[in-house]
Design a protein with these regions (language model features):
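Catalytic-core elements of nucleic-acid end-processing and repair enzymes
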Residues: 1-438
């Protein structure tokens, strides 16, 4: 009974979070309610069941052969890709429908609405109650047209997650397309050391009042931090840092006055921070040596000056790209892209059991209208014995376009200059629009 009630609560919550759009004016009203200090991007899905996932990740055969797809396309039409960087090549492939790790976005809310309304029907086979296909007298399968509800997803992306098309971080993610399907990496102790640094900074902030009376002579009296703390101590729980510092003062400076002890703690925290940063750098080099050799080679094909080290955080990121406006379609659609990295494989998990080149997730806080897959917690990852990874989704308020209103909205958008002929400058698309018009 509890399970049924829980499911009913979930369904009710999902329904409450849906806003059905019936006209352009209703849509503009909803969009105008959004308040954010970040950059707003839109994506229109003609089918509300679609996920924020690039084409190459929609079928396993694509991600398994991503490196082959990339090279095959260039080998067939090399003149179209001559002189282009990897990200420029991926953008051109995306333009022609090749599966890539890019996902189209737009900065124009009406353009996204157009794409959400682009298709209103889908054809499906008719199914009998026993699950078999319905057929006619000749034994041919019967089909029916089903309405498709669309959706506009709205993202609010911070400046630090937006990069120009020629940035080093974009080059890192773009060149993942050249890596084989068995590419994976582990962060080893990198994540722990990063968290440790954050905790040390918090402790420094708590003791910042003693900076004004900072005694440089007192600092000179301290030995290297290695004389007070072992490498094993760096893998203590972060909340034990304060106790560790107090123990060092008690054991090594028992005769110091209270004021000096407080200053000594701050000095020790500074030394601890520097030591942790050094360990973090060594850990980063280790990860590069073990996992990123081929990736670095591919990046240097684009950027010969690229440093011989890759930040693991960048490999597992998602970035919005400030596109190069060298394509009439991108210009007309006010388009840009998300580019997706690859998530790390956790230490306790066999990489062979993980999905191929596991996709990095869009941070849930970016999505302000729509649904988004959220990170599975560490315990669930380690205890999930299923061959299929479990999916958790955060449902936020969704802008749903019912199939019955799509045609009406398309006509309204056309009056505002948003139609197939204005968004797609190619002659065949203009011809399609004119045929539909008459």
């Amino acid at each position: 009974m509890r399970t049924i009630e829980k499911m009913e609560d979930i369904i009710e919550k999902i329904e409450e979070n849906k806003i059905e759009i019936k006209s352009v004016s209703e849509y503009i009203t909803e969009v105008s309610k959004i308040k954010t200090s970040y950059n707003i991007f839109y994506r229109g899905h003609s089918d509300k069941t679609y996920e924020l996932k690039p084409y190459v990740y929609r079928e396993e055969k694509f991600i398994k052969n991503e490196h082959n797809i990339y090279r095959d396309v260039i080998s067939k039409v090399p003149y179209d890709f001559s002189g282009k960087s990897t990200i420029e090549s991926l953008a051109l492939m995306q333009h022609y429908g090749v599966p890539t790790r890019l996902l189209d976005l737009t900065t124009n809310a009406l353009v996204a609405l157009y794409f959400a309304c682009e298709r209103s029907k889908k054809i499906e086979e008719e199914i009998n109650e026993d699950g078999t296909n319905k057929t006619n007298e000749k034994g041919e399968p019967l089909y029916k047209k089903e309405g498709i509800d669309g959706e506009v997803i709205i993202l609010s992306i911070p400046d630090e997650n937006i990069r120009y098309f020629d940035s080093d971080r974009i080059a890192i993610l773009a060149n993942l397309a050249k890596c084989k399907e068995d590419f994976f990496y582990r962060n080893e102790n990198y994540s722990h050391l990063k968290n440790y640094i954050n905790e040390v900074e918090k402790e420094k902030e708590k003791n910042k009042d003693y900076i004004e009376s900072y005694n440089s002579e007192l600092e000179k009296s301290l030995d290297s931090i290695d004389n007070y703390i072992t490498n094993e101590d760096f893998y203590l729980y972060p909340n034990e840092i304060e106790k560790c510092m107090s123990d060092i003062i008690r054991d090594n400076f028992p005769s110091s006055c209270d004021e000096e002890k407080k200053q000594l703690i701050y000095i020790l925290l500074k030394k601890l921070e520097k030591k942790t940063e050094d360990l973090l750098w060594e850990e980063r080099k280790l990860i590069n040596e073990k996992y990123f050799g081929y990736l670095l080679h591919f990046i240097k094909e684009d950027k010969s000056y690229f440093q011989n080290i890759i930040n693991p955080d960048d490999v597992g990121s998602v970035f919005a790209i400030k596109s190069k406006l060298d394509n009439p379609r991108i210009i007309r659609q006010q388009g840009t892209f998300l580019i997706f990295g690859i998530e790390k494989t956790h230490l306790a998990i066999d990489p062979k059991t993980e999905p191929l080149k596991k996709i990095a997730k869009v941070p849930s806080e970016w999505v302000i209208r729509g649904k988004v897959e959220i990170e599975e917690n560490e315990f669930d990852k380690l205890t999930n014995t299923s061959s299929e990874p479990s999916k958790q989704q955060e449902i936020k308020r969704r802008l749903i376009i019912k199939s019955s209103y799509k045609e009406r909205i398309i006509k309204e958008l056309s009056k505002l200059g948003i139609n197939k002929s204005t968004l797609f400058p190619e002659i065949d698309k203009v011809a399609d629009y004119i045929k539909e018009k008459y």
